[in-house]
């Protein structure tokens, strides 16, 4: 099985590991859901103290037929714990809308950027409605996802599917924002997509420095497949960045 890894090259070169990462949702050893920050395919989970401290307070929502339940993540050593987990037929969405703005460039040519990470966890492929600005959704067909931006399908965009061993496969969304992956192994799959919005604008920050030129959205979808071929184990845990 080929092992690969994917980063956002421009962000990695300019800003280092923090902006090249993703967040994803998974079940913790304590049984509840947890928001991770790092690289799933590299078995990298950032920690506190360290890059995990970049986050303010990721917000999450349990989406259920009984109604939605929202809560802020509680920071722990290796992620943000949530007071709920997704049961069969439910899902969880999470995002950090206040990740610190950052600047890059030279001299007077500075670009102010906003990294906007988000995540969804599903328990099956029942069709769901968008909840996140950039959202990967199950369509009702096993293995099929739809990428939606601001409530509308996002066509011709790369989606990457990764398993715990680091193996990954990429595909491009069609005109309806849909993409299909085969999932032969049991275990955890994390799909990721990104989108850059150069409209610019201003957000309300405590320090007042809320103007930005670019928003870089990164969103993931986690699904744990209960059956299939025995998966290759994850490699050794990568050391968190300081």
PLM regions with names:
Residues 14-17:
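N-terminal signal peptide c-region/cleavage motif recognized by signal peptidases
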Residues 58-68, 157-171:
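Short amphipathic beta-strand segments in non-cytosolic proteins
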Residues 76-82, 173-187:
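Glycine-centered loop-to-beta-strand initiation motif
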Residues 1-6:
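Bacterial N-terminal signal peptides that target proteins for export
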Residues 21-32, 106-143, 201-242:
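Beta-strand-rich domain onsets/edges
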Residues 90-97, 188-196:
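A short, solvent-exposed beta-strand micro-motif common in secreted/extracellular proteins
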Residues 63-110:
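Mid-chain, structured segments of secreted extracytoplasmic proteins
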Residues 31-44, 137-149:
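Beta-strand-rich structural segments
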């Amino acid at each position: 099985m080929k092992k690969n890894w994917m980063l956002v090259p421009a962000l990695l070169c300019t800003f280092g590991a923090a902006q090249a990462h993703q967040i994803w949702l998974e079940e913790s050893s304590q049984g509840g859901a947890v928001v991770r920050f790092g690289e799933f395919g590299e078995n990298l989970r950032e920690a506190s103290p360290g890059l995990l401290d970049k986050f303010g307070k990721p917000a999450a929502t349990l989406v259920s037929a009984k109604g939605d339940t929202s809560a802020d993540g509680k920071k722990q050593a290796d992620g943000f714990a949530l007071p709920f987990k997704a049961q069969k037929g439910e899902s969880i969405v999470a995002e950090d809308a206040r990740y610190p703005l950052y600047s890059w460039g030279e001299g007077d040519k500075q670009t102010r950027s906003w990294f906007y990470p988000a995540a969804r966890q599903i328990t099956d492929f029942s069709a769901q409605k968008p909840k996140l600005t950039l959202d990967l959704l199950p369509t009702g067909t096993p293995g099929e996802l739809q990428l939606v931006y601001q409530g509308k399908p996002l066509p011709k965009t790369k989606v990457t599917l990764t398993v715990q061993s680091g193996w990954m496969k990429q595909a491009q969304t069609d005109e309806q924002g849909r993409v299909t992956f085969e999932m032969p192994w049991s275990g955890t799959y994390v799909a990721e997509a990104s989108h850059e919005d150069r409209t610019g604008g201003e957000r309300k920050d405590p320090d007042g420095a809320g103007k930005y030129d670019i928003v870089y959205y990164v969103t993931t979808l986690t699904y744990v497949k209960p059956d299939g071929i025995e998966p290759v184990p994850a490699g050794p845990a990568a050391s968190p960045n300081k």
